[in-house]
């Protein structure tokens, strides 16, 4: 099987592809020479993909500027040029199937593949369908999705296949070596513990609310692992210099083995990006979600509300955050074991433990019938 993958800009477009590639290799359906990732040289993919040793090519492309419409003439020019380059990439690589996960770069490569009658799939991991996937839906053979709300936004109902997010299956496979929290941070593995984090870089609003709530959290009969993000760690340590933080609170810059920590957490406080939610639901971890307001179409809030509706999360809008609702939400989960158990069960129902295999089945079916 020869496959071109394309997605760019954010982790939500990249990690599902990386999970699929890993599973394809595990099942010996591809060699490294039979896959190609097409992205941009500016997005997160330009670091993640080459670092994983995956063959990588770039197209120069950018998104539409909603505030300055006149700048979009350049965007259209770049898109036309990118489709010509995409055509050449497809001709040279000769893929059996092309899979896009969103981002403008996937628009060019998947659109061109569809025109060339190469089997095509898009995968939508959010509740709100992105512009690239909305555009591509008319041309592709199959549309894989995670959230039911996303399915409602596609008019091409016959193309829809609910597969879940491939990251779900990957994170279950990675869940082999748990972090020894007693050894690493001198914490009690039998005590309720909450992990608070805002992604690898961190989230200022989440860090600020933890700072404001710290004195109250220190009095609680549970433990707190506060991952500030690499960007904010120095500032947080500086602000707390000279203050003796209680031993039930551990402040770290980043968690480098999230799948090894999540199964041990009673609760997690986090943003609601698609990749994070795939991890939480795969493992059935109760969550308090503080959606980022700085994302297109406010899709993190929609993702979070879908989780809350299913009973798998509590949601606090960033603008509504205060020490009272923040700490009481954590208390509600950590101090009520029945409630935490119900949330965990609801979360697991949303997870798709074989999501990668489901997407691969769609790929194989298209190749077989082409």
UniProtKB/Swiss-Prot annotation:
Pfam families named in the record: Glyco_tran_28_C, Glyco_transf_28
Gene3D superfamilies according to UniProt: Glycogen Phosphorylase B
Coiled coil: none
Chemical reaction(s) catalysed: Mur2Ac(oyl-L-Ala-gamma-D-Glu-L-Lys-D-Ala-D-Ala)-di-trans,octa-cis-undecaprenyl diphosphate + UDP-N-acetyl-alpha-D-glucosamine = beta-D-GlcNAc-(1->4)-Mur2Ac(oyl-L-Ala-gamma-D-Glu-L-Lys-D-Ala-D-Ala)-di-trans,octa-cis-undecaprenyl diphosphate + UDP + H(+)
Lipid bilayer topology: Peripheral membrane protein
EC number in record: 2.4.1.227
GO molecular-function term, one example from the UniProt record: undecaprenyldiphospho-muramoylpentapeptide beta-N-acetylglucosaminyltransferase activity
Location of this chain's protein in the cell: Cell membrane
Pathway: Cell wall biogenesis; peptidoglycan biosynthesis
Keywords: Cell cycle, Cell division, Cell membrane, Cell shape, Cell wall biogenesis/degradation, Glycosyltransferase, Membrane, Peptidoglycan synthesis, Transferase
Positions contributing to UDP-N-acetyl-alpha-D-glucosamine binding: 10-12, 126, 200, 255, 300
Stored InterPro entries: GlcNAc_MurG (IPR006009), Glyco_trans_28_C (IPR007235), GlycoTrans_28_N (IPR004276)
SUPFAM superfamilies assigned to the protein according to its UniProt record, in alphabetical order: UDP-Glycosyltransferase/glycogen phosphorylase
Biological process according to GO: carbohydrate metabolic process; cell division; cell wall organization; lipid glycosylation; peptidoglycan biosynthetic process; regulation of cell shape
UniProt GO cellular component terms: plasma membrane
Family, similarity comment: Belongs to the glycosyltransferase 28 family. MurG subfamily.
NCBIfam families on file: murG
Function as written in the Swiss-Prot or TrEMBL entry: Cell wall formation. Catalyzes the transfer of a GlcNAc subunit on undecaprenyl-pyrophosphoryl-MurNAc-pentapeptide (lipid intermediate I) to form undecaprenyl-pyrophosphoryl-MurNAc-(pentapeptide)GlcNAc (lipid intermediate II).
Entry protein name: UDP-N-acetylglucosamine--N-acetylmuramyl-(pentapeptide) pyrophosphoryl-undecaprenol N-acetylglucosamine transferase
Organism listed in the record: Lactobacillus johnsonii (strain CNCM I-12250 / La1 / NCC 533)
Gene transcribed to yield this protein: murG
């Amino acid at each position: 099987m020869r496959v071109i993958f394309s997605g760019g800009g954010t982790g939500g477009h990249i990690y599902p592809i990386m999970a699929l590639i890993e599973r394809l290799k595990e099942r010996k359906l591809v060699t490294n020479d039979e896959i190609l990732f097409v992205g941009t040289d500016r997005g997160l993919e330009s670091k993640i993909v080459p670092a994983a040793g995956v063959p990588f090519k770039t197209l120069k492309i950018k998104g539409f500027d909603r505030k300055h419409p006149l700048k979009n003439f350049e965007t259209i020019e770049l898109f036309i040029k990118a489709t010509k380059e995409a055509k050449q990439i497809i001709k040279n690589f000769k893929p059996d199937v092309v899979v896009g996960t969103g981002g403008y770069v996937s628009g060019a490569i998947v659109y061109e593949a569809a025109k060339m009658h190469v089997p095509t799939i898009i995968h939508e991991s959010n509740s709100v369908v992105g512009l690239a996937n909305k555009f591509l839906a008319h041309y592709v053979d199959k549309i894989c999705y995670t959230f039911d709300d996303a399915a409602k936004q596609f008019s091409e109902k016959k193309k829809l296949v609910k597969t879940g997010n491939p990251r779900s299956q990957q994170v279950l496979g990675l869940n082999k070596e748990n972090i020894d929290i007693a050894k690493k941070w001198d914490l009690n593995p039998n005590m309720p513990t909450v992990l608070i984090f805002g992604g690898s870089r961190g989230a200022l609003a989440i860090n600020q609310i933890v700072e404001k709530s710290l004195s109250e959290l220190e009095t609680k009969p549970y433990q707190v692992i506060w991952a500030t993000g690499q960007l904010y760690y120095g500032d947080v340590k500086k602000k707390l210099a000279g203050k003796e933080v209680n031993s039930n609170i551990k402040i770290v810059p980043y968690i480098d083995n999230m799948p090894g920590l999540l199964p041990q957490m009673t609760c997690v406080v986090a943003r609601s990006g698609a990749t994070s939610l795939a991890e939480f639901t795969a493992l059935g971890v109760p969550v308090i979600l503080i959606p980022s307001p700085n994302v297109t179409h406010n899709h993190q809030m929609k993702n979070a509300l879908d989780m809350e509706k299913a009973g798998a999360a509590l949601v606090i809008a960033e603008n509504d955050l205060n020490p009272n609702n923040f700490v009481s939400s954590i208390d509600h989960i950590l101090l009520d074991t029945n409630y935490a158990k119900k949330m965990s069960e609801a979360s697991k129902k949303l997870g798709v433990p074989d999501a990668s295999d489901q997407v691969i089945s769609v790929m194989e079916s298209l190749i077989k019938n082409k």
